[in-house]
A protein has these predicted regions:
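Feature marks short, surface-exposed loop/turn motifs that line or immediately flank catalytic pockets
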Residues: 116, 211-213, 255-257, 306, ...
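Structured segments of extracytoplasmic/periplasmic soluble domains
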Residues: 193-197, 207, 237, 241, ...
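Active-site segments of SGNH/GDSL-like serine hydrolases
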Residues: 250-255, 286-319
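N-terminal secretory targeting modules
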Residues: 1-175, 182-183, 188, 196-199, ...
């Protein structure tokens, strides 16, 4: 038996709003269980928050669907023996281990109650068929269902970065690391694709933040949700994933598409535009540190950007040159799975563009998941 993470998120700063604080609010997150386990612990983080945070209580229960419905075995988690937990700015806390049996394909429902004014800066936005969250006014942690009149869905996950399960030795985790493309649907579809193929001993863990770059990060609030640069997030995000064997890195497109010149955007100077060697060095940084954690690491090629709002041929060229480098490494060729070369530029294949010419469609995310599973499990490179 061993500990394996069955759920995970990166940490960033949320999109800025005049209201930075919440009071008397319940957060609820349903989590898919990929395999059976007998004990449970969760990790909460305030990694990107600059004020201390107190959570009054954290409640878990079982569920039968990706919804807010708690079905049975409702219990409080404790932190150093207390129901309440406190995190310093940029800090974290791990719950006490609890004996809690979960079956494969069940759902774990995690609810957190924020009693006093709480800085909600530290969080991340995620989407996908296995990703959902809720907030509700008042303490509804023990409610079987959240009140319809005082609750709403949200894609923002606050504080919750890891759920760890004590499980059989054959079970393990795959980490998917990246930016908005990975914070969106394909890791969830990968988990579903594994299940479709009766590969039932793998948990897919997402560690991704929209807008992140390998080499740089923003210091302004308009882009605070675009997260930390690679050297400020990579080690922190992967080192806490229990039972991980494999890492997939799909990162670098924002380094290429963001710089436009201060005449267009004061926060995006053209001097931020990386060279090919700088991008390679950034990827080598990831690979060198991944070795420390004994991870089998694959890199994902960057997907098409043709007709994106900052598209230019020089961006196309460096993207394609970077992809050629990535293909010399153990890699998953997402670019050719959902894109095609037309007149020296990669376009999305029919049905694979979400509409913004940068992010894949749901069909494309499914194809990316299939490509990832084929590569990792069928040696189909």
């Amino acid at each position: 038996m061993k500990w394996v993470s069955i759920y995970g998120n990166a940490q960033s700063k949320v999109t800025p709003h005049p209201a930075k604080y919440a009071k008397d609010v319940t957060l609820r997150y349903p989590i898919y269980i990929p395999f059976e386990g007998d004990k449970l612990s969760i990790r909460l983080e305030n990694f990107c928050g600059d004020e201390d945070v107190k959570i009054e209580s954290v409640v878990i229960s079982k569920g039968h669907s990706l919804s807010d419905k708690q079905t049975d075995d409702i219990r409080n988690l404790t932190f150093n023996g207390s129901y309440a937990c406190e995190m310093k700015a940029h800090g974290s806390i791990i719950s006490d281990v609890i004996d809690y049996h979960l079956e494969e394909d069940e759902y774990l429902i995690i609810s957190m109650y924020l009693k006093e004014f709480t800085n909600l800066t530290s969080g991340v936005n995620i989407t996908g068929p296995l990703s959902k969250g809720y907030f509700a006014y008042g303490n509804q942690t023990l409610n079987n269902e959240l009140d319809l009149n005082t609750s709403m869905k949200t894609n923002w996950v606050y504080f919750l970065t890891n759920v760890d399960l004590y499980t059989s030795d054959e079970n393990y985790a795959i980490i998917c690391y990246g930016d908005s493309i990975t914070s969106q649907d394909w890791p969830d579809y990968m988990q579903l694709e594994l299940k479709e193929r009766n590969i039932n001993n793998v948990a897919v863990i997402r560690k991704a933040v929209s807008g992140t770059r390998i080499l740089r990060e923003y210091a302004c609030i308009p882009y605070q949700s675009y997260g930390l640069k690679g050297e400020n997030r990579f080690i922190h995000e992967i080192e806490h994933v229990k039972g991980a064997k494999t890492l997939i890195i799909q990162h670098g497109i924002n380094d290429i598409i963001h710089p436009v010149g201060t005449d267009v955007n004061i926060f995006r100077p053209l001097s931020d535009m990386p060279t090919l060697d700088e991008l390679k060095d950034g990827m080598k940084y990831y690979l060198e540190h991944a070795k420390r954690f004994n991870l089998d690491t694959y890199v994902g090629t960057l997907v098409p950007i043709y007709n994106w709002r900052t598209y230019a041929i020089f961006r196309e060229n460096i993207k394609n040159e970077f992809n050629q480098y990535l293909l010399t490494l153990p890699s998953i060729d997402f670019n050719n799975a959902i894109g095609e070369l037309i007149d020296e530029a990669y376009h999305f294949k029919d049905g694979c563009d979400s509409g913004d010419h940068l992010h894949p469609s749901k069909l494309a995310y499914k194809l990316m998941a299939i490509k990832a599973v084929d590569t990792l499990f069928n040696n189909n490179k």
